[in-house]
Amino acid sequence: MLMKGTTTVGVKFKNGVIVASDKRATSGTFVASKSAVKTLKITDYAVATISGLVADGQYLVNNVRTIADLYSLDTERPLSVRGIARILAFLLRRYRPYFLLAQLIVGGVDREGAHLFNVDPFGTLTEEDYLATGSGSPVAISVIESGYSPDMDRESALRLVISSMTAALSRDAATGDGIDVVVIDDRGVNFLSREEISDLVREVLR
């Protein structure tokens, strides 16, 4: 069974990055999973979100996580966020003409600051201030574009991310079953609890 369909978003704020993804995985019109994990930790300061085929995305993230761990052991410093994104892009290009059907958002913080990268199935790599991928991305990106500011603080960025995800959940049939939200700043990767996310959703929908 091919599990796919999703909405993932990423937004840079003044001191970090926030990414989010829904939990629904579909196979055609069938809801294959209501608890799919599409936001995965790579290092203590970087994560990736997956849209497309879940298995392909997980395979790519597992590979780059291993490479990042080996790099850290060898050099005694973490692999940069740009380095992580470049490796993912290389892995995707390596499988041509047999594409891995996954698009990834890579978000994190390193010595150069906060970064947000888009890596598409062809291995194209771009750095952005905000992103949305997956079947619900047209809805999500319209919400983000209407409210984004480069100097947003953490709380404003969180509300914007939650607003974009709730809009996608309400309009896209392949998006649903809750969301995962991760904040990455100079303190590292922080997966928000269910209670924190629920409070934010209630605040946005109030």
UniProtKB/Swiss-Prot annotation:
Keywords: Autocatalytic cleavage, Cytoplasm, Hydrolase, Protease, Proteasome, Threonine protease, Zymogen. Signal peptide: none annotated. It holds the Pfam family Proteasome. The formation of the proteasomal ATPase PAN-20S proteasome complex, via the docking of the C-termini of PAN into the intersubunit pockets in the alpha-rings, triggers opening of the gate for substrate entry. Interconversion between the open-gate and close-gate conformations leads to a dynamic regulation of the 20S proteasome proteolysis activity. It is found in: Cytoplasm. Its EC number is 3.4.25.1. Its main location: cytoplasm. Residues 1-5 form a propeptide. GO terms for biological process: proteasome-mediated ubiquitin-dependent protein catabolic process. The keyword Iron does not apply. Gene3D superfamilies: Glutamine Phosphoribosylpyrophosphate, subunit 1, domain 1. InterPro entries: Ntn_hydrolases_N (IPR029055), Pept_T1A_Psome_bsu_arc (IPR019983), Pept_T1A_subB (IPR000243), Proteasome_bsu_CS (IPR016050), Proteasome_sua/b (IPR001353), Proteasome_suB-type (IPR023333). The 20S proteasome core is composed of 14 alpha and 14 beta subunits that assemble into four stacked heptameric rings, resulting in a barrel-shaped structure. The two inner rings, each composed of seven catalytic beta subunits, are sandwiched by two outer rings, each composed of seven alpha subunits. The catalytic chamber with the active sites is on the inside of the barrel. Has a gated structure, the ends of the cylinder being occluded by the N-termini of the alpha-subunits. Is capped at one or both ends by the proteasome regulatory ATPase, PAN. Component of the proteasome core, a large protease complex with broad specificity involved in protein degradation. HAMAP family: Proteasome_B_A (MF_02113_A). This is Proteasome subunit beta 1. It comes from Korarchaeum cryptofilum (strain OPF8). The gene is psmB1.
